[in-house]
Curated annotation (Swiss-Prot):
Binding sites annotated in the UniProt record for NADP(+): R47
GO cellular component: cytosol
Enzyme type, top EC level: lyase
Protein name (database record): Chorismate synthase
Protein's UniProt keywords contain Lyase: yes
Keyword Flavoprotein: yes
Recorded metabolic or biological pathway in which this protein acts: Metabolic intermediate biosynthesis; chorismate biosynthesis; chorismate from D-erythrose 4-phosphate and phosphoenolpyruvate: step 7/7
Cofactors, names only: FMNH2
PANTHER family named in the record: CHORISMATE SYNTHASE
Superkingdom of the source species: Bacteria
Species whose genome carries this gene: Rippkaea orientalis (strain PCC 8801 / RF-1) (Cyanothece sp. (strain PCC 8801))
Catalytic activity from the UniProt record: 5-O-(1-carboxyvinyl)-3-phosphoshikimate = chorismate + phosphate
EC number: 4.2.3.5
Amino acid sequence: MGNTFGHLFRITTFGESHGGGVGVVIDGCPPRLEISESDIQYDLDRRRPGQSKITTPRHESDTCEIISGVFEGKTLGTPIAILVRNKDQRSQDYDEMSVKLRPSHADATYEAKYGIRNWQGGGRSSARETIGRVAAGAIAKKILKQVANVEIIGYVKRIKDLEGMVDPSTVTLENVESNIVRCPDPEMAEKMIDLIDQTRRNKDSIGGVVECVARNIPKGLGQPVFDKLEADLAKGVMSLPASKGFEIGSGFAGTLLTGSEHNDEFYLDETGEIRTTTNRSGGIQGGISNGENIIIRVAFKPTATIGKEQKTVTNTGEETTLAAKGRHDPCVLPRAVPMVEAMVALVLCDHLLRQEGQCGLF
């Protein structure tokens, strides 16, 4: 239960961190879309471990295999299965964690819910589960780009108390990928890298905020009342490992304004389209896209598994301590960027198909 996401563009992820592999089954992808492993691999490479000194040193190529649903380079309209095999597991690093519960990790809650857990690498609660999401998100991005020229760009906005200055209306993928922390503010990026590296040497971890902008969004996406577009975006990104907060548009800062200060006033552009002079709504009003840029922010906590000794208990109820072994990210933010993009793409693609199905016939 709980492994499937979406309505018309529907994904089910599978696999564990130290199992044979991880992947996704996509149902509802339109037929005749040109797709190949290379379309998917680019985003998987951005997500994969071992890519820099500020990420986990686990070495995985994360090479994807399309198992079904594609023939002669085009989608068939049938379920698409994508598999990535695990190759660099070091399960012995987790022997101690078979008994000791990691503070603030899913160990204790999985044990409480199921009465059993895969302690090798965190099993299903590992961030390797997101490989399937990123693979499916790459296909969703291609649909959105081809149908509506939608562009989705995520980037690191903040690491701990270091915040970059980024204009979401002009930021490019090249700006984001110009450094290993994926912050488009070059000066702040260097400070972030130094802070993460120092935290790693201290056997600790830090968190931060990923901001994501979706541009060229068609008007009308979103389903009132329980499937509002921002509600589904929040559900999507808040289902990512280590996510702890969600904002759209002005977010919590909007509570400091009056209505006259916060309202996005309307005007007619040169083509007669209704536009807004500001975008404090973040591109969504009444749960439905208004055609402006959708801008969201996702807060990620510090990585739970750290090398510093902490107090904990065993699964048999004895107090003890744990200094975790294994290979872990000192900060999840650089690798979380393509994960956030993927969830945004999945939500927007699903709602695009729903909009066409309900309102696009007449």
